[in-house]
């Protein structure tokens, strides 16, 4: 059975009582629960611990696998927010990927519109230069409501640019909220570029994009079939847990998700034919 590198997104570490959990506490929890890696958001106030991030592998045995950011593809080349993304990317530990949602400040541009593909390509090129120097990747992150909203949008850009450092993220929640059907086709089409996956429990009629974000052992979305499809298509990369807005007892929620994930892995190892359910 293939063993994925497992991480938790930093969205898992926030609730209404504590706010955002301290970096060192996050690391301690992840190690105790059997995670392999940590994941951060790429923003100035979220990188005040950048020096500690560089020491994370030695201190905790955790990889800093990726950082999340948004990039406005309509903004001018010298846009300060876009420039900040590039600057912060360069401060990350070597090998730490940038997972990037492509947005637009022009509300007249519809999600997935191919009319601004050329602008997206233009904005991505300098970040790919940084990725090469950092020995890392830029991974396109489909996100509900963003210009890059669908898996197929990321595939289109990867195919057009043909850059070895440009990859794709499959976000279970955002796929469920935006598309929610033809999962096998989405995965198989993405596989040539797929470098990262994040998953969570989810049900319809929630407050976020019409769906909920929950620990992995709850909700209506069939994450076992998703994991089976990934294995059938040969995906061996990292898999993480999304936790935006869950709140509550962070440790318990992560423990539930990890237990559910390991249970699904075990089922697939015992019944490999079950990977063909969809």
Residue ranges and their predicted role:
Residues 22-46, 94-96:
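Catalytic domains of carbohydrate-active enzymes, especially glycoside hydrolases
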Residues 13, 44-46, 70-73, 102-108, ...:
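Active-site-proximal loop/turn and secondary-structure-junction residues that shape catalytic pockets
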Residues 78-168, 177, 252:
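Active-site acidic/histidine proton-transfer and metal-coordination neighborhood
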Residues 1-11, 15-31, 121-125, 129, ...:
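Histidine-acidic metal/acid-base catalytic patches
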């Amino acid at each position: 059975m293939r063993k994925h590198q497992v991480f938790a997104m930093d969205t898992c570490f926030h609730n209404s009582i504590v706010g955002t959990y301290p970096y060192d506490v996050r690391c301690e929890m992840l190690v105790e629960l059997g995670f392999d890696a940590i994941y951060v958001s790429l923003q100035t106030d979220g990188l005040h611990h950048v020096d500690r991030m560089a020491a994370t592998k030695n201190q905790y045995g955790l990889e800093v696998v990726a950082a999340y950011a948004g990039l406005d593809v309509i903004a001018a080349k010298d846009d300060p927010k876009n420039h900040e993304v590039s600057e912060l990317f360069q401060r990350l530990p070597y090998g730490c990927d940038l997972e990037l949602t492509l947005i637009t400040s022009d509300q007249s541009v519809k999600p997935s519109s191919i009319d601004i593909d050329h602008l997206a390509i233009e904005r991505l090129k300098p970040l790919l230069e940084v990725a090469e120097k950092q020995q890392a990747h830029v991974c396109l992150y489909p996100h509900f409501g963003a210009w890059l909203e669908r898996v197929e949008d990321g595939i289109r850009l990867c195919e057009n640019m043909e850059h070895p450092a440009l990859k794709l993220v499959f976000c279970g929640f955002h796929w469920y909220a935006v598309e929610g059907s033809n999962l096998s086709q989405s995965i198989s089409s993405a596989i040539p570029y797929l470098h990262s996956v994040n998953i969570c429990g989810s049900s319809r009629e929630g407050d976020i994009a019409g769906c909920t974000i929950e620990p992995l052992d709850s909700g209506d979305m069939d994450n076992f079939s998703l994991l089976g499809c990934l294995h059938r298509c040969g995906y061996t990369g990292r898999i993480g847990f999304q936790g935006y807005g869950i709140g509550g007892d962070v440790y318990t929620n992560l423990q539930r998700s990890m237990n559910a994930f390991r249970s699904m892995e075990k089922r697939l190892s015992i019944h490999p034919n079950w990977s063909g359910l969809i």
